[in-house]
From Swiss-Prot:
Pfam families hit by this protein: DUF2335
Keyword terms: Membrane, Transmembrane, Transmembrane helix
Species in which this protein is naturally found: Rickettsia prowazekii (strain Madrid E)
Transmembrane segments annotated in the record for this chain: 88-108
Domain of life, per lineage: Bacteria
Entry membrane topology: Single-pass membrane protein
Name of the protein this chain belongs to: Uncharacterized protein RP532
Length: 110
């Protein structure tokens, strides 16, 4: 286990790797995910975007529809792959079982 060493100030980047707590200097990548609980941003924020860039809401809805269609396509592809794997597994187990029965039967005849 690493020991905690403090060579410089408390939040100095040179202490990187030794700090056990969250550093204030490091960016929080989940900041916007934590800020909004839903898929779409709040209505007041959308209206501000719409006033700055007209057509933002339409583009946002179009992007959400495309992303949802892509997600469904990937899910369907994964389901087909899993179904194919299950089918091949059953076929291989059937062949193995038949081979095992044949081997046992041939040994009993000798």
């Amino acid at each position: 286990m690493k020991e905690t060493k403090r060579f410089f100030n408390k939040n100095n980047r040179l202490n990187k790797g030794y700090a056990k707590t969250f550093s204030i200097n490091e960016p929080d990548n989940n900041f916007y995910r934590k800020k909004f609980e839903h898929i779409l941003p709040p209505v007041d924020l959308i209206s501000e975007y719409e006033s700055i860039y007209p057509g933002t809401l339409q583009e946002l809805m179009h992007m959400a529809q495309k992303e949802q269609a892509h997600k469904h396509a990937i899910d369907l592809k994964n389901l087909k792959i899993q179904e194919r794997i299950a089918k091949l597994t059953r076929i291989c187990l059937l062949i193995f079982g038949i081979g095992l029965v044949v081997l046992i039967f041939l040994k009993l005849l000798k």
